[in-house]
Amino acid sequence: MKIPLAIRLPLRHGLVTALAMFALGNAPAHGAGVGAIEITHPFATPSLPGATTGAAYFATLANTGSQPDKLVRAATPVAASVELHTMSVDAQGVMRMREVDGIALAPKASIRMRPGMGFHLMLVGLKQPLKEGATFPMSLQFERAGQIEVKVVVQTSRAQDAMADMHAH
């Protein structure tokens, strides 16, 4: 009996998702927090050969407190500098990236960072390639919470999406 294509495609997608969730289900969730700031699953995308820039994200960056806070700086030994960036669509429908002076967090609010949209941390002047499976430290400076140290995991976008979905539920 032949299974119709309309049924086979969702089954195939569901199987891939289930396998990714199984593989990541045994991976320890990682994150950090100080005071009211909570960071879950810091990750970076693997860099292309010869690339001098990379990007890092958080599945969630949350402020559980009653006062606003702001991420104002970041640093890592794998890059000469880290810039805070945002991606947005301009009036002509063109995606634009720009550096920002900080990432504001309202009280009781959180943001989700993902490749291709919203905020990210641009790693400028990479000192080594970002290879899948590698980890590196990053120091984050907040106006109120102060300094938070995180361990960033280098992962492909499929693994990142699965982990972000796990943290979102």
Model-derived features with residue positions:
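Extended interaction regions within the primary functional domain
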Residues: 1-2, 23
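Bacterial N-terminal signal peptides that target proteins for export
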Residues: 2-16
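Bacterial N-terminal signal peptides
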Residues: 13-25
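Sec/Tat signal peptide C-region and signal peptidase I cleavage site
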Residues: 26-31
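Compact, glycine-rich, soluble single-domain proteins
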Residues: 32-169
